[in-house]
Amino acid sequence: MKTYYTSLKKFHTFKINVFAKKIIIVKTIKTLIKTWKKCNQENLPFLLLGKGSNVLFTKNYNGFVVVNRISGITIHEQKDYWLLHVKGGTKWNNLVKYTIQKKIYGLENLALIPGTVGAAPIQNIGAYGVEFKDVCQYVDVLYLNNSKIVRINSNNCLFGYRDSIFKKKHNPNSIILSVGIKLPKTWKPKISHLELQKLSFKNITSHQIFHYICKLRKKKLPNPKKIGNAGSFFKNPIIKKNKAHKIICEYKDLPFYPEPHGMIKLSAGWLIEKCKLKNFSVGNAKIYHKQALILINKNNLATSKNIIKLAKIIISKVKKKFDITLELEVQIIN
């Protein structure tokens, strides 16, 4: 019989009541490596978490959960650019606010995204027309088995839509230690996204875009401090233009976005709503009423089985109606 000692409920935003053998908060590289070695000696699994804002635990974790709190921001000024070296345990939104306070602009579209900087390259986080890859210069990876730090240039990170080399070729013995971000001193607003087109390009400021996006996100997304969730549970599907065209011709109100190589991105939330699943629930797992892309832990009483069952129903319904298979954006931890 396995014994679990520590609740993970406050270490992940879905707030599922699961337990781990041990939870350790690390603030230095030395402590991180020491913890990994101890985990290896005890022959137990090792899982690194930031804010736990993109994960769903399906059961108790029979190993060490290590919470990365190695944080810090260093700014280097060049002639035409600002170069930022940011440690992985830094909260992403704290970084965005910090740069704006320092009059360094370019991250405002990525305001209020939960999680830490170390998670940003894994998912290639993005919102309102900007992705992490657009500002990334490099990613520093720490290999725990030999304590070596390897710098990976942005071009070699294989960034895609909510994807990267760190997701495709995950190495359990490595962690993202820090990232390099490059922002031009000559700032240009990026407001081509459908929800930002109400803003006037003339005289718009980074501060205004930041506050506008914060307002949008607060209006339509649940606060994880109050309602358990992991943000977008599904990716917006990217499909071939001819297939998308057939659906768009039938449904004139379908939001879509052109992608490279003749592909079209469709709104997963819209597809889910068209399957008449708005407010649908399984036990205490429920589709969020303001954004169908988000599954919530109602009253923080849902089980992971509830959430997985709800997700499977959604995938099945969308596949049947539109012949599109939704992919998970949330990382499932078994």
UniProtKB/Swiss-Prot annotation:
Function field: Cell wall formation.
Domain of life: Bacteria
Presence of keyword Cytoplasm: yes
Species annotation: Buchnera aphidicola subsp. Baizongia pistaciae (strain Bp)
Similarity-based family: Belongs to the MurB family.
Active site annotation, chain numbering: 162, 232, 329
SUPFAM superfamilies according to UniProt: FAD-binding/transporter-associated domain-like, Uridine diphospho-N-Acetylenolpyruvylglucosamine reductase, MurB, C-terminal domain
Main location, first listed in the record: cytoplasm
Cofactor(s) demanded: FAD
The name this protein goes by in its record: UDP-N-acetylenolpyruvoylglucosamine reductase
A GO molecular-function annotation: UDP-N-acetylmuramate dehydrogenase activity
